[in-house]
Amino acid sequence: MTLQHTPLNAIHRSLGARMVDFGGWDMPVNYGSQIEEHHAVRQDAGVFDVSHMCVVDLTGARVRDFLRGLLANNVDKLQTPGKALYSCMLNPKGGVIDDLIVYFFREDWFRLVVNAGTAPTDLEWIVAQNAAAGTDVTITPRRSDNNAGAEPLGILAVQGPNARAKTYAALPGSQAVGDALKPFNAGFVTVENVGEIMVARTGYTGEDGFELVVPAAQIAGVWERLLQAGVRPAGLGARDTLRLEAGMNLYGQDMDEHVSPLDAGLAWTVDLQSERDFTGKAALQAGGQREQFVGLILRDKGGVLRAHQKVITAAGDGEITSGTFSPSLSLSIALARLPKEVPVGTDVQVEIRDRKLTATVVKLPFVRNGKALVS
């Protein structure tokens, strides 16, 4: 299979990036030291090319009606232009088709940002649900590989305690817009020789920063400006250790179409209180929460927590969904699905290479805004 390329592919290669197949996309895993990239984001500022993710514009008079039924979270929370909401999109059995961010700009214009590997099936599902609902929404994907004739867009995630200041230095005129943004809000700024950029105060690292949605034809210039302002390129390897420390799910690993958001630590993104119906609601109400989603810290030496390892508890077995060595904590950490009866603070056993090693159950996240929340 031929891998898809983001508009920055040649630049990544010129920087010496190690490239990997990520969901059918040729993506940089690191540019040298993954741990140094991780620390740069926790302590200063790093930039990730996330143009493999897909922006989808939804337009029409009944977009809000359509999204009320499509998403598990309630888009009626979005009343101020630029406000964003994290949500899952569910199948009728309550499984997660994808997790995404929805932005509200006008009553006739909402914008989704969906995951890279799921984008084709997401679009098929959204088109089918629109047809079934008769809402007559126009669905326009904006990714470079599938943009329906619309101007293709790329995404740069600038993350870290100094990310905002360095973005302002790189993009003259952006500070007035950026300073006005609260977390999970977005605005637009016009930058000379670039055009209009969407600036969103969102991210996937547990640090402050922006996600910049940039015309694909101009994204190389924006990337170069960020590097000149002292932002360090960072790859998918650091992105994974950062999001894991932040207790953030990775689609396809921590949840998928067979997992309920209630069992993936995402109950806070599901609105079961309002009378609004949505796809998957009845299944969630009937099934309820079966398991809990927690953090683990390995206490014994001699192993690293990894996905699919069995977790043995007095209340029954569970499983690690994601695991790594945490550069910020110098500990092995994991996300895991365990029986609901296991309290935080409990020591459990993890099967690692025919050995049983002790780990402690902790509340997520492990790290937020550069600070360790566990020990």
From Swiss-Prot:
EC number(s) given by UniProt: 2.1.2.10
A GO term, aspect molecular function: transaminase activity
Keyword Acetylation tagged: no
Keyword field contains Transferase: yes
GO biological process: glycine decarboxylation via glycine cleavage system
Catalytic reaction equation(s): N(6)-[(R)-S(8)-aminomethyldihydrolipoyl]-L-lysyl-[protein] + (6S)-5,6,7,8-tetrahydrofolate = N(6)-[(R)-dihydrolipoyl]-L-lysyl-[protein] + (6R)-5,10-methylene-5,6,7,8-tetrahydrofolate + NH4(+)
Record-linked Pfam families: GCV_T, GCV_T_C
GO cellular component, one term: glycine cleavage complex
Keywords: Aminotransferase, Transferase
Family: Belongs to the GcvT family.
UniProt subunit comment: The glycine cleavage system is composed of four proteins: P, T, L and H.
Functional summary from the UniProt entry: The glycine cleavage system catalyzes the degradation of glycine.
Annotated protein name in UniProt: Aminomethyltransferase
Native organism: Ralstonia pickettii (strain 12J)
